[in-house]
Amino acid sequence: MPEEYLNAQKMEKLERIKSRGINPYPSTFHPSHTSAQAVALLVEIETQENHLKEVLKLAGRIMTRRDMGKISFMDIRDGSGKMQIFFRQNDLDEASIELLKDLDLGDFIGVEGSLMRTRTGEPSLAATKVSMLSKSLLPLPEKWHGLQDVEKRYRQRYLDLISNADARQTFLTRSRVISVIRAFMNAKGFLEVETPVLQPEAGGALARPFITHHQALNCDFYMRIALELHLKRLIVGGFDRVYEIGRIFRNEGISTRHNPEFTMMESYQAYANYKDVMDFLEEMVSSVVKEISGGYTLPFGDITLDFTPPWPRLTMRDAVKQYAGIDFFDFPTKETLAAEMTRRKLKVDPAKDWGKLVDELVGEFVEPHLVQPTFLTDHPVAMSPLAKQKPEDPRLTERFEAICANMEIANAFSELNDPVEQRARFKEQLEKRSQLRTDESESVDEDFLAALAYGMPPTGGLGVGIDRLVMLFTNHDSIREVILFPALKDREDTKTQE
């Protein structure tokens, strides 16, 4: 960081601290309690006078400061919360009195003292000693307004977390959602595993991959676009229930619902089909909602989402008929469906095949009507190259998407385990991509087909978008609000505090 960005007044104080032989950046300090523990301890023992003089050690960042002659009050914050520190010069040694003069908002300090309440009843620590732990050299965002520039909030998330309690709570909730999901999966007998991020083939989804080069092996690798194919290899290998919570990378557009790097939870269960997985997902999500919120509802914008089981189930064909007035099987080719969409004044991308056009109809006409959690089922084969066909209608697959708040939060199907049919689907998919000249991954994973050829039991697979799920739990309508460091276009003028 160029020195001109540093605050001159803070730099002067830093030099004064150093001149007194104090290291402004010591290597350690051992608090005896967190702020939350100190407040709880005060409540517990404040009627027992003999314990109130117990010496505690707290540490945190100075968030506010009020000086009144020989008395000062500071609020410090650690990871558990806030604690008021009461400084009276008569109670401090000379070194602490001098250090107090050079402390600013944003500095990290360690304090020793005993618990007390002020005349207004505020839990406080009456300090007898203060230690410098880290000198802040840049001013914090203004207290009452925080960080107002939305893009800067994302670029400098550390400042957002310092100044915005809602941002801190969002990521605490995110962590808890993932922990509760993990506990649920473990309790159901699923084995958590880790699969490669760097892969020789980009498979498991229709998406454009990121490509990188391995110098030692002198070959290209893809950043994974899905967890699916390696997890199904583990089902082949004899694990009946597996799951992974991991990062996915897709070299595609950015929006309020899409980030190039995002988190998925995928699970695979032997001897299950998509209806079993539907019941499982319904139980999992409603259980997580109840564990975190205490009930089955969540506020989202100006509506209330109700996750009480069972959720409505609607076939994709019926949904498109109902909301778009189109039976997509009446337009069985890309050309006829594109013509119908053009007639309805919808923009048609010539690079998209029939399945992608159907998906656009769903996004344009169906999803805006699906606010409460709903299962959209029975997708066409053209949209689902890894899913089993429905025996009663081979044009459709045993697949569902869970839609909530007008966006997909999960996708699942009865996994295709016929290696001959899977190879045929892959080849058809590859031919379509070649004709359309798309930038999506264009290779057949021969090792995955070999694994299927050894035999995979009937399997139900599930993918849950963790980021979108967290959006629902935290009442955010942008995925950037729930990802600590979302992808942004580089901009030099925001790399440092202005």
From Swiss-Prot:
Positions with a binding annotation for Mg(2+) 1: E401, E408
How cofactor binds (record note)? Binds 3 Mg(2+) ions per subunit.
The record's section on Pfam families has: tRNA-synt_2, tRNA_anti-codon
Query: Where on the tree of life does the source sit, at the highest rank?
Result: Bacteria
Entry-linked PROSITE patterns? AA_TRNA_LIGASE_II
Q: Does the keyword Disulfide bond apply?
A: no
**Major site of localization recorded for this protein:** cytoplasm
Q: Which GO terms describe its molecular function?
A: ATP binding; lysine-tRNA ligase activity; magnesium ion binding; tRNA binding
Cystine pairs: none
Q: Give EC number(s), comma-separated.
A: 6.1.1.6
User: Where found, per UniProt?
Assistant: Cytoplasm
Per the UniProt entry, what is one GO biological process? Answer: lysyl-tRNA aminoacylation
Name the reaction it catalyses: tRNA(Lys) + L-lysine + ATP = L-lysyl-tRNA(Lys) + AMP + diphosphate
Question: Which annotated residues bind Mg(2+) 2?
Answer: E408
Sorted alphabetically, the Gene Ontology cellular component annotations on this record are: cytosol
Keyword Magnesium listed: yes
Q: What is known about its subunit structure?
A: Homodimer.
Protein's name according to its UniProt entry? Lysine--tRNA ligase
What organism does the record attribute this protein to?
Dehalococcoides mccartyi (strain ATCC BAA-2100 / JCM 16839 / KCTC 5957 / BAV1)
